[in-house]
From Swiss-Prot:
Belongs to the PEPCase type 1 family. This is Phosphoenolpyruvate carboxylase. GO terms for cellular component: cytosol. It comes from Erwinia tasmaniensis (strain DSM 17950 / CFBP 7177 / CIP 109463 / NCPPB 4357 / Et1/99). It holds the Pfam family PEPcase.
């Protein structure tokens, strides 16, 4: 571990020096000296020197408006470079992530040694493995795409420098390139000028596929196959591709008026166009490689020329022309041209798979397996993973939009107001219409704009090639009729197959009622016939945590999942739980392995479907090597959770969790909902109002333009508290509940739960992570600089609570300090703090200046505004998450 720290620190130090040289060249020695002084004061302040802490505050408070931006940019860019160095070291030869494929082999060996597990059972579990990662734009990823490309190349240079056999000339060339990249990054504006459109967000997702996943997935499957062969002597079938990628970019219209039916249609076409582009590159390589003449009769027949000397090349050239004609058609459609569909248009994966697989089988049969298992196998696996759609999309819409659409139809037909009907009457009407052969909507009817948009979206889903839409997700689902309503609207649009429709249960009450809703649905014969033994349910993490606090929310999520698993098992239904986790702890984020093993037994039998959000996509899938590491981690955790499920919790533990949940929820809501001073304190102690100015994503920050905390989306709510380092949503109520239960005499049981129950130990681990990133003196400084003195007592109360919560968690975990069992993460946080602290202090100063200017009725100072945006991006980089 120490070797890794020193290697990482030396890279961080080298990149820091290159950045310093760049700043000196660009702005002169004086600015660099100022930055260096601030860095040294910050380091000394972190080491406990109070005099230097005061000097740090005074230096940053006294910066002129002209100095603000260069200083903010220096520390923000340094944190971006630190993140690159850390990401590289997770996959470097002596890094943590590089060991993940080996960890997979260790998992296989551990499973083999279990007395009650046969090798056949392990191979069967492996064969049914299913992992679907849903990329979402919520864009907490605030780094511009142009900067990301430069940072990826920095990573590549670090990798080259690790080679031991470099000549002096080669070393000098790599260092020269690094200097160029650091200079390019410095001279590039890191803040977007405009909010991205939903199409921009989708393009960002396609860039992740092109730059990382396209290479990473086949490489991961090669490594997986090698590990399985080493452990069991078993070769994975060619069509075994347990990983799929779906996207919400261009499909998630919940609270986002910018995502329309036309946008979804455009993104679907753009995605298919990008797929043709990437497959054309693969086919070009295969045309070059597959020059052999010996083949099976099937290949001869497929190539259409019995005399062909190079039959494989003929087939590849035919595929190339089919891809090119499809690409040209899609390019025309994207420009709005009305075109006749070409006869050979690619709309289904089988059109690519069958010719490629025929060639694969022929090469194997003719003794050329070594060639078959090269580029051709990689392309076959890409067809299975990405295929013609490239990334499938989910459509997500709020339940009330469907209710309002159907109510408009029933009123027009003279049937009354659907919205005012009882749940039983709604269900009876919906089932009657679902069984009816006539259309629901009359031809001459003109719907309102809102209803037309809902119906048009369903039509887009019906027009899309089958398999392009992965699921229809209903946010704020509360009743069986919410699910039946969507099935009726999809039927009306012309969908003649059972598209997965997933209710999303996201508030505390909805999670508690989830099992009742699904039980009622599964008791409807028509519904059971439709779903053919498969059901997807989405569990919301972020909104439930905002509603009730993390402790109560995580317990409600656990119980909802447990009840749904048992209900579906009893009904003979395969349940896929879709986890709507965020990157931050307050939105359900946790290290993948720990998070999966802490779920209820049986929760992964139907596979894992999970959202990957914003900046976490770049951290986990930004490079092919990182992709391999992340997918290996998920694979091992799913297998382990399915074959060695955690024990059912003891009855007394459930009782303790009920108590913890009740106490924590009461305290959390006592502050957030009921304390008269809480909202004014939140608005002044955090940059919540200023965040709205940041061009973060296509979706508005609030569900309603007016309103308090409850109307704020979960992401800006978390983001704001992350910025001022109080991290409040990720801990409020949890530690106090633990303290209360200890005082009730249950410390021994809490320690046993921490030791023997993965669900509980993961909760505590997540709290420790948050506490490590929180900072009392910085949170206090924000109060002193920004908050009215009348609200200071509330701030002090919250900080005292945080301090007491930290002690409670350390007592139960029997640790002297935070993150004792994860020194690598503790080291990473410590390394960043030296650079994040000045950004936090500077941010408080900038907020102060900006608000004073506003109060005086003056025009905002562009230098202050720009520097403020840079500090927000910089702190996000330092915390390694936004919302």
């Amino acid at each position: 571990m120490n070797e890794q720290y020193s290697a990482m620190r030396s890279n961080v130090s080298m990149l820091g020096k290159l950045l310093g040289d760049t700043i000196k060249d660009a702005l002169g020695e004086n600015i660099l000296d100022r930055v260096e002084t601030i860095r040294k004061l910050s380091k000394s302040s972190r080491a406990g020197n109070d005099a230097h802490r005061q000097e740090l505050l005074s230096t940053l408070q006294n910066l002129s408006n002209d100095e603000l931006l260069p200083v903010a940019r220096a520390f923000s860019q340094f944190l971006n470079l630190t993140n690159v160095a850390e990401q590289y070291h997770t996959i470097s030869p002596n890094g943590e992530g590089a060991k993940n494929p080996e960890l997979l082999l260790q998992t296989f060996q551990r499973l083999k040694q279990q007395p009650n597990l046969t090798e056949a059972a392990v191979c069967e579990a492996l064969g049914s493995l299913s992992l679907e990662l849903v990329l979402t734009a919520h864009p907490t990823e605030i780094t511009r795409r142009t900067l990301i490309h430069k940072l990826v190349e920095v990573n590549s240079c670090l990798k080259q420098l690790d080679h031991n056999d470099l000549s002096d000339y080669e070393h000098a060339q790599i260092m020269r390139r690094l200097r160029q990249l650091v200079a390019q990054a410095w001279h590039t504006d890191e803040i977007r000028k405009y909010r991205p459109s939903p199409v921009d967000e989708a393009k960002w997702g396609f860039a992740v596929v092109e730059n990382s996943l396209w290479e990473g997935v086949p490489q991961f499957l090669r490594e997986l196959n090698e590990q399985v062969e080493a452990a069991f002597g078993y070769t994975l079938p060619v069509d075994f591709v347990p990983v799929q990628f779906t996207s919400w970019m261009g499909g998630d219209r919940d609270g986002n008026p910018n995502v329309t039916a036309d946008i979804t249609r455009h993104v679907l076409q753009l995605s298919r166009w990008k797929a043709t582009d990437l497959f054309l590159r693969d086919i070009a390589v295969l045309i070059s490689e597959l020059s052999m003449s010996e083949c099976t009769p099937e290949v001869r027949e497929l190539c259409g020329n019995p005399e062909a000397l190079e039959p494989y090349r003929e087939i590849m050239k035919n595929l190339r022309s089919q891809l090119m004609s499809t690409q040209a058609y899609l390019a025309g459609r994207l420009k709005g041209e009305r075109l006749t569909r070409p006869a050979n248009l690619l709309i289904a994966n089988e059109q690519l798979w069958e010719p490629l697989y025929t060639c694969y089988q022929s090469l194997q049969a003719c003794g050329m397996g070594i060639i078959a298992n090269g580029q051709l196998l990689d392309t076959l696996r890409r067809v299975k993973c990405f295929g013609v759609p490239l990334v499938r999309i989910d459509i997500r819409q709020e339940s009330t939009r469907h209710t309002e659409a159907i109510a408009e139809i029933t009123r027009y037909l003279g049937l009354g107001d659907y919205e005012s009907w009882s749940e039983a009457d709604k269900q009876a009407f919906l089932i009657r219409e679902l069984n009816s052969k006539r259309p629901l909507t009359p031809r001459q009817w003109e719907p309102s704009a809102d209803t037309k948009e809902v119906l048009d979206t369903c039509r887009v889903a019906a027009e899309a090639p089958k398999g392009s839409i992965a699921a229809y997700v209903i946010s704020m689902a509360k009743t069986p009729s919410d699910v039946l309503a969507v099935h009726l609207l999809l039927k009306e649009a012309g969908i003649d197959y059972a598209m997965p429709v997933a209710p999303l249960f996201e508030t505390l009450d909805d999670l508690n009622n989830a099992n009742g809703v699904m039980s009622q649905l599964l008791n409807i014969d028509w519904y059971r016939g439709l779903i053919q033994g498969k059901q997807m349910v989405m569990i919301g993490y972020s909104d439930s945590a905002k509603d009730a606090g993390v402790m109560a929310a995580s317990w409600a999520q656990y119980q909802a999942q447990d009840a749904l698993i048992k209900t579906c098992e009893k009904a003979g239904i395969t349940l896929t739980l879709f986890h709507g986790r965020g990157g931050s702890i307050g939105r359900g984020g946790a290290p993948a392995h720990a998070a999966l093993l802490s779920q209820p037994p049986g929760s992964l039998k139907g596979g894992l479907r999970v959202t990957e959000q914003g900046e976490m996509i770049r951290f986990k899938y930004g490079l092919p090597e990182v992709t391999i590491s992340s997918l290996s981690l998920y694979t091992g955790a799913i297998l382990e959770a399915n074959l060695l499920p955690p024990p059912e919790p003891k009855t007394e533990w459930i009782g303790i969790m009920e108590r913890l949940s009740a106490v924590s929820c009461k305290m959390y809501r006592g502050y957030v909902r009921e304390h008269a001073e809480f909202v004014p304190y939140f608005r002044s102690a955090t940059p919540e109002q200023e965040l709205a100015k940041l061009p973060l994503g296509s979706r508005p920050a609030k569900r309603r333009p007016t309103g308090g905390v409850e109307s704020l989306r979960a992401i800006p709510w978390i983001f704001a508290w992350t910025q001022n380092r109080l991290m409040l949503p990720a801990w409020l109520g949890a530690g106090a509940a633990l303290q209360q239960v200890m005082e009730d005499g249950h410390q021994d049981q809490l320690e046993a739960m921490c030791r023997d129950w993965p669900f509980f130990s993961t909760r505590l681990g997540m709290l420790e992570m948050v506490f490590s990133k929180a900072d009392l003196w910085l949170a206090e400084y924000y109060d002193q600089r920004l908050v009215d003195k009348s609200l200071w007592p509330l701030g002090k109360q919250l900080r005292d609570q945080l301090e007491s919560d930290i002690k409670a968690v350390l007592t139960i975990a029997n640790d002297a300090h935070l993150m004792a069992d994860q020194p690598w993460i503790a080291e990473s946080i410590a390394l960043r703090n030296v650079y994040t602290d000045p950004l936090n202090v500077l941010q408080a100063e900038l907020l102060h200046r900006s608000r004073q200017q506003e109060k005086a009725g003056g025009e905002p100072d562009a230098r202050v505004e720009q520097a403020l945006m840079v500090t927000i991006a910089g702190v996000a980089a330092g915390m390694r998450n936004t919302g």
